[in-house]
A protein has these predicted regions:
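Residues at the C-termini of beta-strands that transition into short coil/loop
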Residues: 15, 27-28, 47, 118
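Single conserved hydrophobic/aromatic residue that forms the stacking wall/gate
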Residues: 1-13
Length: 141
């Protein structure tokens, strides 16, 4: 059974490349890469990122946690995030429409968040991230 989605194909069938819905919704970790293009639909990177950093005393389970890639400091995490926004900027020229970073906060054993799970530590340099995001937003106008 195939159920149509108003948002994107990822929600209606397991193979997100099937031509249903209004979006081609790809998920790629960790780097934002679009490995397919569909001229008939919005091309969306529904998930990318997963930049991990274990912040001691701010993790769900000390002995069990992961990220798609691991770093050891706020600067390293921020640098990687900025690198990814530069990659997004390059994708816009090729017809890219949107992206969703995974994830805003750590979730249980996943340490991929921009903040710790209890939201007490912001793991990135907010000013640099804000500037990088603004550059992307301005390029879409």
């Amino acid at each position: 059974e195939i159920r149509l989605s108003l948002v994107g194909s990822e929600m209606c069938i397991r193979d997100s490349h099937y031509t249903c819905g209004d979006m081609l919704d790809l998920h790629n970790y960790p780097a934002p890469e679009m490995y397919l293009y569909d001229a008939q639909r919005a091309n969306v990177l529904g998930e990318y990122g997963g930049i991990g950093w274990v912040v001691k005393n701010h993790i769900w389970e000390p002995d069990r946690n992961w990220g798609y890639i691991q770093f050891n400091s706020s600067k390293e995490v921020t640098d990687e995030y900025i690198k990814y926004t530069d990659m997004l900027y390059d994708l816009i020229i090729r017809g890219f429409s949107a992206a969703v970073y995974t994830q805003t906060t750590d979730v249980e054993v996943e340490v991929n968040g921009l903040m710790t799970y209890e939201r007490k530590v912001i793991k990135v340099d907010e000013k640099r991230v804000r500037e990088a995001n603004a550059r992307i937003c301005k390029s879409l106008k």
